[in-house]
Amino acid sequence: MIRIQHLLYKISLSVVFGLITSSLFAQLTMGAKGLGMGQATTAIPGYEWALFANPALLNSDNAAIGFYGLRNYGFAELTDMSATGSVPTKLGVAALGFHRYGDNLFSETRIRFGYKNDWQMLHFGVVANYNHISFGADYGSGGALGLDVGIAAELAEDLWIGARSTNVNHPEYGDIDEELAREMAIGFTYGLNELAVFAFDVVKDVRFPVSYRGGLEIAVIEDLKGRVGITTEPLSYSLGFGYGKDRWSFNFAVQKHELLGFSPGIDFMLYF
């Protein structure tokens, strides 16, 4: 009886989300801070999860490791889990990341190697991204290697511009003839005397309409920050907060999809 109920639950889940296919893809942008700011992460300087956003803005100040989890729409089967680590060196910043989405019926795994450097006012980064998808039972699997690039610059004090492009080599899973997601984005951020940060992105996935993303971070009290954001295509709203010290930080956010409901995300960072 329990197995039958579990099977019916799986079937219902597949039917419901099969009706809204554009929402089934794993999150490409990681981190609860970015989630709380509407995923407008293309131009946030020193963003801890820049390896999954714009690699040109990897943190150059400290070595860091972090862990992130997101439960999409409250379903355990649609969970994103990821980890990241970065180390500044004399030759630039090296970074390594891992991301997994899904369950035993369908899963997507990404392993990312990133590098960032700068020349005068220009910051640039590149990521080699191995993607692997697996279908349950004997339905097969596939892998592909993608290449992401990003650039960024500080136009004026606390005013940043960034741009990125994912999978510029047009990779595809050979055995199943499926292309990886390809996305281009440009973004701006402006910091207001350490009291607030405004972020705005324009993102175009080749499969979907243009998405506009905006976010705001406000310093509430010492070491505590509040965040709100909005994303279009699909329409979603988000809010969250972050608290941190010199050696660690903690971030939490909730995203509300216009049709599918709430997705809570949490991350924890350590700095060395």
Regions found by a protein language model. Name each.
Residues I2-V15:
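Bacterial N-terminal signal peptides that target proteins for export
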